[in-house]
Amino acid sequence: MKKIIVSLALASVLLSCKSTVATSNKQEEVKVTIDLIDVKDDKVQVTILAPKINSDQITYSIPKIIPGTYSNDNYGRYIDDLKAFDNKGTLLEVKKTDENTWTIPAAKKLYKITYLVNDTFDSEKGAGFGQEDIFSPAGTNIEVGTNFMVNMHGFVGYFQDKKEIPYRVSITHPETLWGATSMIDLDSKNNSDEFVVSRY
């Protein structure tokens, strides 16, 4: 059976971070799940389990600029339907403060964030990279049955003052997809991959 390639282009954000191995000591981390199985309307769902937050409010941001391109690409414009929940599944208030940032006032209650990601390839209209279009190698692509280009800065953001803690990223996918990445997959299953990095 022909293999379908899922391109996990982790270079921009996560590849620049040091890989780490899981330890037996429980430590603070951000847990991320990217669902490449249940794709609807060309959008991928991302779930972020929040670390312990002691502040009264917290911001969650998707990058505006990434190393290597240095253009104002505003990856937050590709995020839809961002929601925050407490540990009982109750919706928390979320305020979008700019194109790339969301503020959660009841931060101490925050358990998880969910949102949908659109890909950048579909939005390229020939306006030019650094204008309205995003430089393709730094972009994201969602083509069910063909490929996914998962540049992490287009899928995963960061909490204010929490960029220096580890990230555990789990990607669920059909068994016919395999990930092309230089990172070490800590999950041996055929339908999921897991990567751990020391910081955002």
Regions found by a protein language model. Name each.
Residues 1-29:
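Bacterial Sec-dependent N-terminal signal peptides
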Residues 21-38, 48:
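Non-catalytic, glycine-rich low-complexity segments
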Residues 30-34, 45-47, 97-101, 151-155:
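Short structured motifs
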Residues 36-37, 68-134, 159:
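A surface-exposed beta-strand-loop module
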Residues 44-76, 156-174:
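Surface-exposed beta-strand/loop patches in extracellular or lumenal glycoproteins
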Residues 51-57, 87-90, 105-110, 172-176:
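A short, structured loop/turn motif at beta-sheet edges
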Residues 114-200:
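Extended, low-hydrophobicity, Ser/Thr/Pro/Gly-biased non-transmembrane segments
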